Structures are given as C-alpha cells and as structure tokens.
Amino acid sequence: MDKFLYFLVIILTVFSCDYTQKSTRSIEDLVPKNASVVLSINSLEGFQSAINNNALISKTGVFKSLKKALIPLDSLKSLSPLLVCVNKEVKSQVFTFITHQRNLSSTDTLLMPYITLDSILVASTSAAILESVKMQSTSEYSKLSKLQQTSNTFSVYCKTFPELKSIPILNSQSVYFGFNITPESIAMNGTILDQKSQNKWFTLFKTLEPQPQSLQTIIPAESTRVNSFNYTDFEQLTRNIDSAGFVSKASTLAKAFFSTTKEIGSFETSEGTGIALKSIDINATYEALSSFQNELSSFRSVPLFEFTELSLFTDAFGPLLSSISPTKFIILEDYLVFSDSEKVLQLVISNYLNKNTLETFDAYETIQSALSDEASFQTYFDTPSLGTVLNELFDSTLKEKDLSAYKLSALQLVKDDHIVHVNSILQKSKSKQSKTQISEAFSLTLSNDILMDPVFVTNHRTKKKDILVQDMDHNLYLISNKGVILWKKKLKGPVLGTVEQVDLYRNGRLQLAFATPNRLYIIDRNGKNVERFPLKFKDEITQPLAIFDYDKQRNYRFLITQNKNLLMYDSKGKSVKGFKYKAAQPIGSQPKHFRVRGKDYIVFSAGNELKLLDRRGTIRVKVKEPIDFSGEAIYFYNSLFTTTNTKGDLIQVNSKGNVSRQTLGLDAKHDITSSSKTLVTRSENKLSIKSNSVELEYGSYSPPSLFYLRDKIYISITDLQAQKIWLFDSQAKPFASVPVFGTSAIDLANADADAPLEFVTKGDSNSLIMYQLY
C-alpha cells in the first residue's frame, strides 16, 4: 500500500508539471520571409494623423497606396508597434500586418484573415503567409529591431532599395530609415545595411573623420544643387578612391594643390556649374597655383584667373564630383571657386559681397538643426531638384507648386566606426521675422471636432511643451510641439476646467490630473492611468478638480466638488479623513488655495457666501457680508480675496472677513482675470488692463487670459464671432500682426526653448493652430 501511494505521488507530480513552451517571440520574429519592405509604426493613430496633416507626403503615390492598404485595420486601436510587411509576387503585392493581440478589442472586427500566435496578431492578404509564419521562430528583420526608435513616426526597412538616378550617391541594396513627420517637416535618419555599400563608404573615407561643413559661406544661396565633402588628408583620399574600385589620377599639381585644402564641393546655378574649395593655408595654396597667374578680367575688384588643367578635378576625385572642365578661377579670402563659366564666378562674387550665400539663406538655417554638425558627404536640393528626387523615390507626380514652401532640403552621409548614417531633412522655409511679428508654426486637423481649448503641458523629458486637447468624442490627445499626435485616450466624459500637472512620485516625472463629471483621472506621460486611478464617483462632479500642494513638498491633495459637498483625496487615491467640510449651499466656484502670512485658505463661493476654510475644511474666517456673485473666479489681488458681483463692482475681502466694494462700471456679462498685481476686465467691447483701456471691435469675446513670461505681461482675448485673436501688452497696446485667425482662447508659452514664444488655439472646428510670436 505504501509503495502504491509513493508511485501515485510521483505520477501526480509529473502530470501536474507545466510542459507548455513559453514563447519568447516578438512581433519582429514573425515578419514573413522574403519581405521586401517592412514598415514599423509606433502608433497607428499618430501615423495616420502625421500623414494626413503633412500636405507633401499625403500626395505621394506610395502613401496613398499605404493608406488604402490600412483600411481593413480601422478597428485596430494601436498604441504599441504595428508592423506592415510587403511581399512582392508576380502580379501583386501581399500585405501582412503584425501587432500585439491586445490592440484588437473583443468587440472589434478585423476585415482581413488573421491568426493569433502567443498573443501576437498576424493578419495577411495571403493565406500562404499565415500558414508559413505559424512555425517561424525568428526572422531576418528581428535583428534590426534595435535600430527602431520610439520617437519616430515610423521606420522603413527596404531589403532592395530602388536605384535612384536623382541621388546616385544613395544607391544601396538595403537600407533602414526612421522618419519623423510633422505638418511642417519630414526628417529622416537611418543607415545603409548591405555590406557592399557600407564597404564602399568605409573605404572612401577610411581614416578620414567626418568634419564640419564650411562651403556654405561661399556658395550662392540660389544654387539648385550642392554636393560637398571633407578630407583631412588628400593623398589618403586618393588611395581610398582607388581602393573603393574607382580611379584617382592625382597629378603632382593635384597633390600639391589639394593638400592645401580640406573641403570641396560642386554647385549648380542657372549660369552653370562651379567647384568651391576651402584652403587650410591660403599662402601655400597661392604657391601651388603660382603657374596660373594670368588674369583674364576682374569683377568688383576680384581678379579672374585663367586655368588650363581642365581634367584636374575629374582625374583626382573621379565620381565624387560633377564632371567639369574649369577654365578659370577666383580666390575670395580662404575660398577658391573654379568654373568654365565667367558668369558663374561673377555670380559667386556678387552673392558673397552682398552676403547672399547659402549660410545667410533663411532656409539653410532652418534645416541645419536637424542635421549632424559633422558629415562625410552632404548634398542640398532646391525646390525643383527636390521634386525630381521625391517623384522618383515615392512614385509621385508632385509639381513645383506642391513644394514651393520647401526652399532648401538636405541629405548627408556620416561614416562612423561601424556604420554609415544617413540623415535628411525637408522643412518648410520661413523668413526671419522682425520683433513682435506673429507667424503660423503649424496647423493640425483631428478626425473629430474639438471640445476643450488646446493648452500647453510640460514635457518633463525635454523641458519643452506639448499640447493637450480633447475632442467631441471625449478623446484626449497629447500632441508634440511639432504637430505630431503622441497618443489618444478615450475618457468617460468631458474634462472639467483645465488640466493640471503633478509630480506624484517626486522624481521629476509629471502626470496629468483632471476631473470629468464622474471620474478623477491621473495619467502618466504615455497616456496610461496611474495606479489606483481613475477614481469613480456615482454623484456628478460639479466643479473642476482643485489640487493643493500646501507646503510645496509634492504631498498633493485632490479636492472634488459635488454640488454642496467637498471630498478630499491624497496621492494614493485615499480619502483624507481629517478634512470635514459642513455642506450648506451649492458651491459656485472652483475651490482655490492661497497662503497668506503663513496661513492656508481654501476659498470658494457657496450661495451668497465667500467661504474661507482652513486645511481641515473648517471655517478659518467668517466673511461679514453676503455677496451677489457674478460667477467670475476668485483671485488674490493686491493681498485681498477678489471677485466681482452682478452689478459689476469689484468685491475684495481681507483676512479678517471685511468686505470692500469698488464701482468699476462693468456690465452684467463682464469677464475678469487677475494676477497678484494686475487686474484685467472686459465689459462689452472695453478691455481694461490695470489703469489702461482699449476699445475693441464689437463682438462676442472669450474671457481674457493673462500670461506672465520673461518679466513681461501678455493679455489675450478672442473675438469668437469674428474669429480674431488679439494680444496686448500691460499698457493695453496691441502687438504687431494682430489680430490673427483663431476660434478659442489661447495658451501662451515658450514651447520649444528657442527665442520666440508660441501660442496655441483652436482653428476650424476640428483643427488646432500653433503660432510663433517673435
């Protein structure tokens, strides 16, 4: 009997063990074999928005086809990566979509055959591919996943990159590019993957480190195409050219001359082609060219010298330079320019003396921040040249008018120790603005009408600003200051009042805190609910969420208003037992916290009483007179609790509960806002800032907004009827370039840490606009 029990225990133990193989497959492991293109999308919503809101990329044939291919995925709400794979067959293309199963809710229907493998969803237009991936444990593409950056709008892997006549320098068998798309720009960063192309670039620039570019100082701004590269050792470069499979026939003159230079570039103009060089020792350069002193002519006191070594550049640099046989040259300070056209050299002289070079071109300055400071090779395109490149690359028929805002674009190659980086930027060009000018930075269209006025929130990672907005379907969006949707989150109702930011964990990482009619939300940077939140309420929340940080120690108190009642919660979502407010009448304003002479005051209106409570919810000071509140918020102005009554009088209460009244002559439908020292009022069409006033056009106005930035006061107000935004200083004087178009109140901040300020507003019913204030 004992033996039987012994064996029974062993059998039960064996059969109770879990022999299920734990899968470690990622979505990258299930990319089909022989996929010619793999598109990795970090957020489907953000990707679709970026494509729709970039007027240039939305017109390209490739992305029109891709949008059509994505239609079956309309039910997919993806915040995590989605892979779009393309396999080429004889007569068509096969699309396969791979993502985590959690992105397909149980109520959704996917309009395409699909399978699920270990919580990974694979959908495809090919049944054969669905069968083949079932037994697949990894893929070639999975090795590239480390190149993916979550900040990218999307990335593209091309197993066989098409040969481009417009950019032969980029011809490579396989590449991996990451794209950041905003309404104003297309930025690309990636790498060349195939060994043959990598070896070519490694060989060409062996022991020649990337260097800063300087030829922009001499090349005319009106150049249509520019190619330039650096070399710290010319003779090493010639050996590299030979080793890379090309031929460099550097003569004795070439070695003597080019060894005194460090950078060379070709540029094309309407008058012809030129070659520019930067000398590292102009005296040595003069000596190397001492046999070319025959002055043909002069232009604006600059001599043009004859040059007879017609094949010097082609022989020395081979395919790296445009084929040109220069017959003359000029010297301007440390720069030399060669050409076979006198008009080209005259153009260079004229533009250099007039400071109209690439370096001074607004468009050049615009794109440089997106490029590496040091490069091995760099090329610039003007508008027509860009059109040629894009039409070839994206199977498009873009016309020059479609590209008119893109005055200058660039592509660069940077040879690193183990990789060849490719960077490119297409950026809408904007002229420099004079002081107090306003220009539109971007506009962004959402799929639904906007409910909540857009506001700025701080990005704790970059110390810059992002934009928060809610649509009519109660979706909350976080949008970058470049116009890229970072995430979208469905809420249970409209946001009440404004959204505040808190540092719940005291680590510098900020969360968003706000209330809807039946929820208290705290959301992290990625759009995820913080643990224990949202708090749910059966009774309706009737005022915006109030957040108090009494001692500035980030020990937050969250105050919920429900008609007559106040409920206080701590950072863990637990009720604060020490707070007990005895409800009397319905609360008419959002509770606020003020600290006056070391004492805390929680202030709000209830019926015709101004309540001044302490931290525990008991009356700190009894206000001695009733107040017929106008409905305006309560402020702490000139060391007094301040609001207005229905007669338009200014009502102020001191810390002893005494009430004073000042007749302001405001009408019944007035607005006020205030800082500690500045009072702003609007009555009919009269806007008053401190003691200064301005007559506005008759209209229907938003409440005025007051901003204090860089020791300066800004007052904004929007004519909702005429759709005009006005901006004034503390003297009630309007800024230049106002009014500008807008349909809501604005939020003003320094959104991107540069010199100009930015403000964001609602545009059309489903769009927002960010302006720059110079």
Residue ranges and their predicted role:
Residues C17-L111, L117, A127, M135-T138, ...:
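Structural boundary/hinge residues at secondary-structure and domain interfaces
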Residues D108-L170, L321-D395:
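A conserved glycine-rich beta-strand in the N-terminal activation segment of trypsin-fold
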Residues K432-M452, V484-L491, V530-F537, S575-A583, ...:
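Aromatic (tryptophan-biased) beta-strands that constitute blades/sheets of beta-rich domains
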Residues S443-H474:
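Beta-strand-rich domains and repeat architectures in extracellular enzymes and scaffolds
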Residues D449-V455, P494-V502, D539-F548, Q585-F594, ...:
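Repeated scaffold domains used in trafficking and secretory/extracellular systems
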Residues V457, R461-K464, L504-L510, D549-Y556, ...:
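Acidic, glycine-anchored loop motifs typical of Ca2+
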Residues N481-K482, R525-G527, S571-K574, D614-G617, ...:
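Short loop/turn segments that connect beta-strands within beta-propeller blades
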Residues A745-Y774:
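Blade-level signature of beta-propeller repeat domains, shared across WD40, Kelch, NHL, RCC1
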